[in-house]
């Protein structure tokens, strides 16, 4: 499938712009300046539209390609401010720090945790263990899941120090707080960021970071010869 058909700019320009924004802590205007220095004149609002469109495409392709998970998961929620209001990002990672899934919600409650865990179960099945913090909503969600026959073989652990990995993993996302304009755009942007970080982490785990290029990785993911 040609994901770049009908665009005014060449696909290489779009890939570089989207890759810069999702990989590095840059604003849309800063990406615009970097492209301008390379002789490419593109407005920051156009870059914004590209990021919103292709973040969702990349996340879908990444999820489709990576359906396996390890026996141990870590799940947590963090606060993200969007236009002055707090929202809640649920994230789950495996033992190597690779992102399994994310979910951005307006509320932090049992129903949101239940729905997210149910979605994880549908995608990956049951892990041997899940490590979370001691939030009451998570404990209630697990009880509700057990009552419908889900996660019956999974040990739910709430030892605080075991969850340090995912708490550290929140930081790059939270640094972008000031750029999130709505729940929808924040969700799209975070999906793109998680995809690129997931690719980076997987390459690091496999020992193939030498010569890492975000543009090349996006091309590979979208089926374009690198």
Give the role of each language-model region.
Residues 1-23, 39, 43, 48, ...:
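Basic, short loop/linker segments at the boundary and entry of helix-turn-helix/winged-helix-like folds
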Residues 102-124:
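Active-site beta-loop-alpha junctions of metal-dependent nucleic acid enzymes
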Residues 69-82:
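Two-metal-ion RNase H-like nuclease active-site motif
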Residues 134-191, 195-198:
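Helix-centered, glycine/charged polyanion-binding patches within enzymatic domains
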Residues 49-71, 148:
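Short, basic alpha-helical nucleic acid-contact segments in DNA-binding proteins
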Residues 17, 31, 47, 76, ...:
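Mobile genetic element proteins and their domesticated derivatives, centered on retroelements
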Residues 27-40:
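DNA-recognition alpha helix
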Residues 188-195, 200-226:
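C-terminal domain-tail junction helix/linker
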